[in-house]
């Protein structure tokens, strides 16, 4: 039971960080140009109206793919491809 609670909290924190990045970019706040060391992938979130790109860890990519809404397309690229 403890492991389930810890896993849930880790997922919530990870998803919260990813959503924070999306919200920052959606609100027009300039994000850093370079990814952090742990962010080895570029996550692209495509919805009906917007396409958002940000750096993410492998775990964040997996979580976002699982938690995506219908109509959203999420892809993850290797390396720092967000600025391309």
UniProtKB/Swiss-Prot annotation:
Q: Which residues form the signal peptide?
A: 1-18
All disulfide bonds of the chain are 21-42, 35-55, 61-76, 77-82
Keywords annotated in UniProt = Amphibian defense peptide, Disulfide bond, Secreted, Signal
* Record InterPro entries: Snake_toxin-like_sf
Main subcellular localization, coarse class?
secreted
Please tell me in which tissues this protein is expressed.
Answer: Expressed by the skin dorsal glands.
Q: What does this protein do?
A: Lacks alpha-neurotoxic activity, has apparently no antibacterial activity, nor anti-coagulant potency.
- Keyword Signal assigned to the entry: answer is yes
Q: What is this protein called?
A: Xenoxin-1
Q: Name where it's found.
A: Secreted
Q: Which organism is it from?
A: Xenopus laevis (African clawed frog)
């Amino acid at each position: 039971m403890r492991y389930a609670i810890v896993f849930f909290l880790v997922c919530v924190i990870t998803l919260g960080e990813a959503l924070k990045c999306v919200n920052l970019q959606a609100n027009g706040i300039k994000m850093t140009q370079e990814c952090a060391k742990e962010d080895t992938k570029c996550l692209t979130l495509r919805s009906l109206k917007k396409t958002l790109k940000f750096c993410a860890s492998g775990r964040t990519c997996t979580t976002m793919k699982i938690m995506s809404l219908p109509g959203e397309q999420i892809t993850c690229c290797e390396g720092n491809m967000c600025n391309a």
